[in-house]
């Protein structure tokens, strides 16, 4: 009787089938886990990015202000201006003491009881793009004309090209003779890259959207409205010059 020195074809096929039964589910589990991990990182990144954007917007709005017009009542609507063009692009603009390094250079244009401060102008632009549901959010800083860093067209920065929705809404609450004005900020960001949506590699109906909201207190405005008759040093004239 001879000893068997090799596997038969049937035995090899049985071994291969058993290995496939083990490998295929394992591969699917690992593949699904990898995709889930990547998706988790994407969503975590977009949440952190949205929080950074809200922090920047909040900083700009909390230091917002308005030109002084004697004899007129002042409200949050003096600060805020919004326009929409024929293409659906939205531009939100307001004056503010915010503006990077310039914040530490807010100096009076004259001495005395009414010393004007110079303002910067900031624009947030929500731009629609052809062929994609993604919008672009830009921030443009126009430094006061007397500032050495001021330049025509302002300092433009793209904040995000993954925007679904962006809104700043001014509101005022009145009670017992006092009022409190504030801004409601709403922001929605996609967790996918805009180029992927344009190429059709993702389903726009299944994209994860991270939603953010914040309320912002315009400190200077509320202080002036609720403390009438105080020194007007923090009123400002954006067109004031040295002299």
Please report, for each region that a protein language model flagged, where it lies by residue:
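N-terminal leader/signal peptides at the extreme start of proteins
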Residues: 1-7
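Aliphatic-rich helix starts adjacent to a transmembrane/signal segment
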Residues: 7-63
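Short, glycine/small-hydrophobic-rich surface segments
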Residues: 61-94
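Type IV pilin-like appendage domain
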Residues: 83-176, 206-209, 236
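Short linear sequence signals and composition-biased patches located at protein termini or domain-edge surfaces
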Residues: 153-243
